[in-house]
């Protein structure tokens, strides 16, 4: 009898065969081994049986990791082992987290840890969809109050046709990279980048992915049933309804009034004062029954319901706007003298200082993946310091949120960047959020577009971004343009759209409730289009196309072509020649096998100096031309004279003077500089020189 109680489920998901398995590996956790095509991911879920005392939030942690052995590789670095999570791993962790988090009920505070490990990969496709499906299956058998399962799908668009779960080869031809996740009845999460696609094309991709994932959801349900998954016995905590009614009677009107204060810090101060008043009124001095915690919860719930009721009843939003109005905008470019490109983009109380820096190919980011090492010529780094929201905090490396927001902003800009052969600079954008009250990632998109044009980067089109929100109760709903931080926190959807006047370049959607219909998504997309066009119009008043020249402080780029046979002369023995040129001119030089030479100089003069040295090395000797040469060796029958780097010719004794000489050393000595004329170059490349009738300096 086997020591393993293995449960398997196989199903076809688009072009890939999927196998779910449990009971063989990591049996002390709720574990699923999922194989999808050539990718295998081990997903382990561990849930604490009870919440920690005093816990007032849901501690869900998702860690996605790629083991290098999965692709038959040994990690780099001194220790030769996997280190901290890469940016790609962090982004995939967020991708898994976002659709499962809203499916746990309010009040469930038991700690849950999800670990998804890629253990095998044929390097033909991403492992994220397999990891998401594996997580869904592991949660389905974990006995937690998870209202799943979820399905997930990647959607591409090739030649106008949607493609389900495309591989790397197909993605290279696709105009769209969209990941959608959801339940049987609703879409929960969308993450995408696109090449300026229409709203209809994007909505169609979301609906296509949701329809196709139903087979995965059905298979996971059948898998969980076969594994004997038991329903959770967790019961939601009851709340003091009498206290809720008293709080509402005493504070609903006051909270509603506080939410008419437009300035965020003043509004927060007023709400904090009301909360303190509620605590003083309803919490006894000796709080043995935990009334303080109940007041905290019910007060937050009252704030939530008050703002939502105001919006749905048609009242002005927190800052006095209607549902479609974008906050006041201020657009400035060229705000930093030495930066290659800079912009200060302000939208209400959200502000981003965005810079563009241009570098040479050696500044490219080296990215280590399961498929191997690749170079990335475009970087966008997003920073969210504590001071941007008027708080103190410890400065550290980028957190998951910053990495995620930076990637979203990058997606919004990438589609409009020029091709590398047209603009071969490495581009680094940094967005420093200096103020924040909602939609800082979309402010980063706007600022990035502005700073790129200020730097002289020839964009295909300017881009802008806007964050949309939703409040929905029953059949009533309101879509909000350009949401505040409070509206994001108190709303049901965070819907971010970036794009140009021609179409969408990035779409991100996170939905906290079920029941978001096609109609609501269509309304949100169309309303976002109107908002995006308004923002673009305001940006275009300041700058609408790239400056004609790059910044005088940016490196100068030049391209020349040399004879491929001369490449080794430019490089020199052991790289000595090219290294000397680089050190002398401070220019970076890249040479391709076809003879294309790219020169990046810190200044235009540096680039020109490097090119002059390269051309001197690679120049072809011209018969009849006079050269400045140096005697490098004297022999009995003449002298060898260097006329160009790496090029020597023979000056025969009979060609040294118009008069007959007996000894070469009577006229010449080694190291002497002379003017010589090329008489002839034979078919073997040997050069004959003369000094006759050539006036010497």
UniProtKB/Swiss-Prot annotation:
Gene Ontology biological process terms from the UniProt entry: mRNA catabolic process; RNA processing
Catalytic activity, as annotated: RNA(n+1) + phosphate = RNA(n) + a ribonucleoside 5'-diphosphate
Keyword field contains Metal-binding: yes
Database matches in SUPFAM superfamilies: Eukaryotic type KH-domain (KH-domain type I), Nucleic acid-binding proteins, Polynucleotide phosphorylase/guanosine pentaphosphate synthase (PNPase/GPSI), domain 3, Ribonuclease PH domain 2-like, Ribosomal protein S5 domain 2-like
Domain S1 motif: 624-692
Domain KH: 555-614
Domain of life: Bacteria
Localization (cell): Cytoplasm
InterPro entries given in the database record: ExoRNase_PH_dom1, ExoRNase_PH_dom2, ExoRNase_PH_dom2_sf, KH_dom, KH_dom_type_1, KH_dom_type_1_sf, NA-bd_OB-fold, PNPase
Gene3D superfamilies: GHMP Kinase, N-terminal domain, K Homology domain, type 1, Nucleic acid-binding proteins
GO CC, any one term: cytosol
Cofactor: Mg(2+)
CDD domains per record: KH-I_PNPase, RNase_PH_PNPase_1, RNase_PH_PNPase_2, S1_PNPase
Function: Involved in mRNA degradation. Catalyzes the phosphorolysis of single-stranded polyribonucleotides processively in the 3'- to 5'-direction.
Protein family (similarity comment): Belongs to the polyribonucleotide nucleotidyltransferase family.
PANTHER family: POLYRIBONUCLEOTIDE NUCLEOTIDYLTRANSFERASE (PTHR11252), POLYRIBONUCLEOTIDE NUCLEOTIDYLTRANSFERASE 1, MITOCHONDRIAL (PTHR11252:SF0)
Subunit-structure text: Component of the RNA degradosome, which is a multiprotein complex involved in RNA processing and mRNA degradation.
Name listed for the protein in its UniProt record: Polyribonucleotide nucleotidyltransferase
